[in-house]
């Protein structure tokens, strides 16, 4: 067992509740934050359901990179809250800023917060009393939002990775994590107990899932090799249930407050898994679900507009429609759904092509599927220093989609308009942007080289779905239509990109769409790899596999695969000796700058 990085104090349940009682008594001596917020009347609207609430929340945004900004390399209790607030480049939050955001079309503000790292000594001595000054500053920002007439979401947001304590090898550390979680939310809930139902608590950000065994300054013995997905799900469910129970136990308005439950990794597909469950609740119709949407990451999450893959084909718009439609699983059960983060994130070189179309289609579908959302923004779109959008079209989009513009319209009308607009967008979208692209049908198979460069700046069709439009500008690809057993060549030329080469590799694989369906049992036998015209020798043997039983795959560099999938891997001759998911060694000198890469392989039945 590795040495733990924080002193652990043994805590019994009796000690926890004794500490929380002290916290409650201390907070009772602090003037209620609600008293400083004249616009918040403390009213809890009787009979208001979670679905009805989300319709009232309109469109929202995040106060990104602000109160969650933290530095785990220099934890210094007692720093001024403003030290953190501006630490990641954002300006000091003001009343004028929130009022202008509301006027710009945002009816809801999500305030991400790093409570443990910025406002407790959990990493130093295992204590989790929140610094009153930090709590005061968050409350002050909440008051700004309430004065502006906005709904407010408060969460605990990554927060230095302390969540990995839940997955520690030490039962003592795991118990401390749960004690700290209960203690944190008790303090927050008591502080905001008198606020109206315009203030919503969110159980986590993206941490309830595979990050529950993340190593950090808080814990370096997380059980990354021991926790199964079933255990991840069970633990995430337990934490969410603890969140609900903790808030309800604080009484007052918190007995009926709307609570936002973070989905599994906030991923739509993983949250729709039957292993993930919404918590039980003593309040009726007061639970909301939180998920995020950044698909595809090669476009929405690309660090530069120049390096982002193309987006805007018929298939792209249809995919967004299908993904958001999956959330009806929850709305049909009466849960409100908040997409707590989404965006075609601006690159460091500006907005991406089709940003407006991405956001408009997203908002149309939210109208149709009865969802609300909060844009992830760190002054990339609404520039807080300027108190204005960076783009007139985005300003018009959000300015025309707020709650005020929907006044007097019933939901059926809004829903029908959203569906009609989305359908028109899909109908007008091109099938492909790529000239001479191979069109995949149910009756053919296509081979291609999936790729992410080492800086995640360049990408081509990563994933099991073949998409020739998912390509960074300037890349030229050679794909191959599979017509039967034979020899084929695929590859990529990076010389036309802005940087002129692929800076190493972060992920690479050969894919054959429909390979498992049309050619079951076939193997990909690599004959030759050429990088910049020279033969490159693979380090180990590549094996054939499939993640979805539709697309055949050979991993060339996939560091996320930690073991060979026995039973789902095959090679010529039947054995798996020498098999590796990383036959390309990214430390080889010829991998540092790749201008061209071509791979020739046989596609033949396994012998």
Q: What residue spans do the PLM features occupy?
A:
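N-terminal carbohydrate-binding accessory modules
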Residues: 35-108
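Acidic/histidine-rich helix-loop elements
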Residues: 64-93, 122-130, 173, 298-319
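An active-site-proximal structural segment forming one wall of the substrate-binding cleft
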Residues: 88-109, 119, 124-158, 162-203, ...
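Catalytic domains of carbohydrate-active enzymes, especially glycoside hydrolases
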Residues: 92-114, 323-330, 363-365, 372
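Active-site region of glycoside hydrolase catalytic domains
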Residues: 175-309, 325-344, 368-371
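Aromatic-rich peripheral "rim/lid" segments of glycoside hydrolase catalytic domains that contact
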Residues: 349-433
